[in-house]
């Protein structure tokens, strides 16, 4: 309240001062008009004055109008002033002249009023010396006045700063030719403008200097280190740094769905296999067996491999899946996934480039997502009677982009169809039973190219079956007998060309053989018996119609080109250490083949020109099949004759 009362009092004082100023101004105006009227009466009209006298009277009248008396003596005549001839007068002390007359200006009188002492009036005193100006205050008559002195001013010229502006209008030059002097002037102006702009930029940079970052407390550091954003950032960054340390190529490649560039590098000519590289991690691969492998369709340089448990490390997870990268030379996996049961089968989820599916020894189906920074599965199936309760050796995603399912088969003969969006319960389930009483212990499964309904399976008894998912003949169909031991690998023909060979498939077994089959006949077309140990896996080339690869327990990789020879492999190589090779997988382009051994190592070989099909490979392979059928028919006839004899 005291502040408001003080403010009101201050406003009242200001209003009183304004009223006093107005009254003083009005009084002085009336006095001036009265003096003008008196002087007009005293003056006598002169008719024949000269122009000089007339101008003098006008000047005196003008001086009177502003409150200055014209009675002091005339000042010196005016001269043309320039900067060189300009002088300033300063105040010097002089004695007060009692005869001098004073006139106060209204503006000064009003501006000098202050406080409660009333208006303070300043007056101008004209001395007999016209170059001296005396200033006197009515309240300070005893003070000494100041005398004006002469001081010369030094002139300094500064060029005005040129402002250059541009517009988007069409500018047409007025003159097509300029003199050399004009051009030099323009260049000088441009250089000055450029220097000015550079100086301004430097000044701005100096002004915009960032303040030094403050030191984080220990609590803030721990909070950042354990935040989810930091973990995601760190997980991706360490992969980039590893690439940078091991590579000189584009380490910032992002897997965003772009087309794969053809792999650059030296391709070995001829039929010899050339070792490319080895994948092995001292922590995750040691003392583990490679149980399955798969190449990514979306990113052909990525390969996933599954491993069983490490008996020497009981505290480590039993099941491990590692994603390896062929594009970079780093020795660590791109992603590490694990679960609490040995992973017996694994594959990339087709149409879902970020998902990896695994089948475990316990019967669970697990799903990993590389977008999550977690290494454990993001989804898993329940261990219940509705799902699998036996080891799952077969996982496969079949269908199209808009309609696809995950097909899994366990060793108890149960086949389930799943949606990748929900693994809590299968969409369909079927018991693979032969003769409605004998469950099929499935060890391998394969779908023909372009078929999602019919498939073939291999069993522990050595028998091969055809099966169907839907229709009146759903379940086990035909029986193919020929192997004398468990079927370890089965694969359908994959190369697409002018002739359809999708009815062909090959199998491998513990009986040391690889057999060629057709779904049109329940007996093998041919048996390849060049191995001296268990044959653990077999796979057709994805691009060559007559080429397939197989691996055995002696660490040998064989490539068979049936157009060249059916008795011995076209190319063969034994890995270092002679460890048993468990799995073989072709890359999508058919130029590399990867094999996994019992020591947890993955070996990648370049196939070279052997894998490149010629235009006549399909017709040659068709003739080869005709010859194989003819030889089989002859052998069957000979066997029949011998039995009858």
Curated annotation (Swiss-Prot):
It comes from the Eukaryota. PROSITE patterns: WD_REPEATS_REGION (PS50294). Changing residue 148 to G: Disrupts interaction with DYNLT1. The modification Phosphothreonine is found at residues 105, 176. Residues 1-13, 20-58, 189-221 have a biased composition (Basic and acidic residues). The modification Phosphoserine is found at residues 50, 100, 107, 111, 114, 179, 197, 635. The keyword Acetylation applies. Changing residue 158 to G: Disrupts interaction with DYNLT1. Gene3D superfamilies: YVTN repeat-like/Quinoprotein amine dehydrogenase. The modification N-acetylserine is found at residue 2. Residues 1-58, 96-125, 169-221 are annotated as: Disordered. It is found in: Cytoplasm; Chromosome, Centromere, Kinetochore; Cytoplasm, Cytoskeleton, Spindle pole. Changing residue 152 to A/Y: No effect on interaction with DYNLT1. Its main location: cytoplasm. Residues 96-107 have a biased composition (Low complexity). Homodimer. The cytoplasmic dynein 1 complex consists of two catalytic heavy chains (HCs) and a number of non-catalytic subunits presented by intermediate chains (ICs), light intermediate chains (LICs) and light chains (LCs); the composition seems to vary in respect to the IC, LIC and LC composition. The heavy chain homodimer serves as a scaffold for the probable homodimeric assembly of the respective non-catalytic subunits. The ICs and LICs bind directly to the HC dimer and the LCs assemble on the IC dimer. Interacts with DYNC1H1. Interacts with DYNLT1 and DYNLT3. Interacts with DCTN1. Acts as one of several non-catalytic accessory components of the cytoplasmic dynein 1 complex that are thought to be involved in linking dynein to cargos and to adapter proteins that regulate dynein function. Cytoplasmic dynein 1 acts as a motor for the intracellular retrograde motility of vesicles and organelles along microtubules. The intermediate chains mediate the binding of dynein to dynactin via its 150 kDa component (p150-glued) DCTN1. May play a role in mediating the interaction of cytoplasmic dynein with membranous organelles and kinetochores. This is Cytoplasmic dynein 1 intermediate chain 1. It comes from Homo sapiens.
């Amino acid at each position: 309240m005291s502040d408001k009362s003080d403010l009101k009092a201050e406003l009242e004082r200001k209003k009183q001062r304004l009223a006093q100023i107005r009254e003083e101004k009005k009084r002085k105006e009336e006095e001036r008009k009265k003096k003008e009227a008196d002087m007009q009466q005293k003056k006598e009209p002169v008719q024949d004055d000269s122009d000089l006298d007339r101008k003098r009277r006008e000047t005196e009248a003008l001086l009177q109008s502003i409150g200055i008396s014209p009675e002091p003596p005339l000042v010196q005549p005016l001269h043309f002033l320039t900067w060189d001839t300009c002088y300033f007068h300063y105040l010097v002390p002089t004695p007060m002249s009692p005869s001098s007359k004073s006139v106060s200006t209204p503006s000064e009188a009003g501006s000098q009023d202050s406080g409660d002492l009333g208006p303070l009036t300043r007056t101008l005193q004209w001395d007999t010396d016209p170059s001296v100006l005396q200033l006197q205050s009515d309240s300070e008559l005893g003070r000494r006045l100041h005398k004006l002195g002469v001081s010369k001013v030094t002139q300094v010229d500064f060029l005005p700063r040129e402002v250059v502006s541009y517009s988007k209008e069409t500018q047409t030059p007025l003159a097509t030719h300029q003199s050399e002097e004009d051009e030099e002037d323009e260049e000088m102006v441009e250089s000055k403008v450029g220097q000015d702009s550079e100086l301004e930029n430097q000044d701005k940079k100096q002004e915009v200097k960032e303040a030094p970052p403050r030191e984080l407390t220990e609590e803030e550091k721990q909070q950042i280190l354990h935040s989810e954003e930091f973990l995601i950032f760190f997980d991706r960054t360490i992969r980039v740094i590893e690439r940078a340390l091991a590579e000189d190529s584009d380490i910032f490649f992002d897997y965003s769905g772009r087309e794969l560039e053809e792999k650059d590098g030296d391709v070995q000519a001829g039929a010899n296999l050339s070792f490319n590289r080895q994948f092995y991690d001292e922590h995750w691969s040691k003392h583990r067996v490679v149980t399955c492998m798969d190449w990514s369709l979306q990113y052909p340089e990525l390969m996933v491999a599954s491993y069983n448990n490490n008996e020497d490390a009981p505290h480590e997870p039993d099941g491990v899946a590692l994603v390896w990268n062929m594009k970079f030379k780093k020795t660590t996996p791109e992603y590490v996934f694990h679960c609490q049961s040995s992973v017996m089968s694994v594959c990339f989820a087709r149409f879902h480039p970020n998902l990896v599916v695994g089948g475990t020894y316990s019967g669970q189906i697990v799903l990993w997502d590389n977008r999550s920074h977690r290494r454990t599965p993001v989804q898993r199936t329940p261990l219940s009677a509705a799902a699998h309760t036996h080891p799952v050796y077969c996982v496969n995603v079949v269908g199209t982009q808009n309609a696809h399912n995950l097909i899994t088969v366990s060793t108890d003969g149960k086949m389930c169809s799943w949606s990748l969006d929900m693994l809590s319960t299968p969409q369909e389930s079927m018991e693979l039973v032969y003769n409605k009483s004998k469950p099929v212990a499935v060890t391998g499964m394969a779908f023909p190219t372009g078929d999602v309904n019919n498939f073939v399976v291999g069993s522990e008894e050595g028998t091969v079956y055809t099966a169907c998912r839907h229709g009146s003949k759903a379940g086990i169909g035909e029986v193919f007998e020929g192997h004398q031991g468990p079927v370890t690998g089965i694969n359908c023909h994959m190369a697409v060309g002018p002739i359809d060979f999708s009815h062909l498939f090959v199998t491998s077994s513990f009986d040391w053989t690889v057999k060629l089959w057709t779904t049109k006949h329940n007996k093998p077309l041919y048996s390849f018996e060049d191995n001296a140990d268990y044959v653990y896996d077999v796979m057709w080339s994805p691009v060559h119609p007559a080429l397939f690869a197989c691996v055995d327990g002696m660490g040998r990789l064989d490539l068979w080109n049936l157009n060249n020879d059916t008795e011995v492999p076209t190319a063969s190589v034994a890995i270092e250490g002679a460890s048993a090779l468990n799995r073989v997988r072709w890359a999508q382009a058919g130029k590399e083949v990867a094999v996994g051994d019992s020591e947890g190592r993955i070996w990648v070989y370049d196939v070279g020109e052997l894998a490149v099909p010629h235009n006549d490979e399909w017709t040659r392979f068709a003739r080869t099949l005709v010859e194989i059928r003819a030889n089989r028919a002859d052998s069957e006839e000979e066997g029949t004759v011998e039995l009858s004899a």
